[in-house]
Amino acid sequence: MKDVREILKKRPLLFDGGMGTYYKAKPGQECEQANLLDPDGILTVHRAYLEAGADAIKTNTFGLPRMAAAQNPMWEAMADEGWKLAAQAAAKTSAAVFADLGPAPDTEALPAAQIYTALAERFAALGAKNFLFETLSSD
């Protein structure tokens, strides 16, 4: 796995595209659930992006902050499997893997910072060194 800082010294970093758009999860199923229910499908998408030339792929975990906030008991398993699948897909390449985290609701009962801390700690324990916090509002 290349150090993304070395790539960025030479050129922009080329990420994969949207997992949910490419995967087209089954109706009523969150894309992140496919980490557990269709791991081969998620691996196929990761590998397609790598074969297309992506320098980095994102874990299929964009929606986890929302799930963790809703206290979905499966968020940890989805995080673990999301990391495992992305790392497996990138293992024989020079691509970097980023733990991907989308927007989290910010409530008094469960502040967004607490959600992001729990998720970041989980991914760090799994070996993540790169994180992408995306599609966040400035509110």
Regions found by a protein language model. Name each.
Residues 1-139:
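Domain-level signal for soluble alpha/beta catalytic cores
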